[in-house]
Regions:
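Positively charged n-region of N-terminal signal peptides that target proteins for export
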Residues: 1-5
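Sequence context surrounding c-type heme c attachment/ligation sites in exported
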Residues: 26-58, 64-149
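Sec/Tat signal peptide C-region and signal peptidase I cleavage site
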Residues: 16-23
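Bacterial N-terminal signal peptides
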Residues: 6-15
Length: 149
């Protein structure tokens, strides 16, 4: 069963990557911006809870963490070769000249968001806040190097 799921995941990714490779650069950039918007949409309320701007709600926090963990793996698809130009973007050209490093940083985001979802599901506020800082660090590592100010 696990092998079947893994095969389906690989085939799904290959199909999505192939479809994105056939898209115009501006379509890929639109996709990228959309994924990042959804990630930010879910990150912001979690950040507000961690910073104490709003009361911590474990159920809401876990919902946002789960959504973020679902979106993070999709981010890399939005940085397809040739999508460095074609529309207004905050992505620095260094992404494509240092793609392995960029990909590594995005993989860190995927891993930290997955862990965030698992920790948040357990409902422990202190542990969720601690993991959120690691998640924020993964975001910051990529933004500092690869996102225009």
């Amino acid at each position: 069963m696990i092998q079947r799921v893994a095969l389906l995941a690989v085939l799904s990714f290959a199909t999505a990557a192939s479809a994105l490779a056939q898209k115009k650069p501006e379509e890929v950039i639109d996709y990228r911006k959309s994924v990042m918007t959804v990630i930010g949409w879910n990150f912001a309320p979690m950040k507000d809870m961690v910073k104490g701007k709003v009361p911590f709600d474990a159920k809401e926090f876990a919902t946002h963490a789960q959504r973020l963990a679902g979106m993070a793996p999709q981010a890399l698809e939005g940085f397809a070769k040739g999508s460095d130009t074609g529309a207004e973007t905050d992505a620095k050209p260094e992404i494509w000249t240092h793609f392995e490093d960029f990909q590594s940083k995005l993989n860190d985001l995927v891993n930290e968001s997955k862990t965030m979802s698992e920790v948040a599901a357990a409902g422990d506020e202190a542990k969720a806040k601690e993991q959120f800082k690691k998640l924020g660090g993964a975001c910051k590592a990529c933004h500092d190097k690869y996102k225009k100010d």
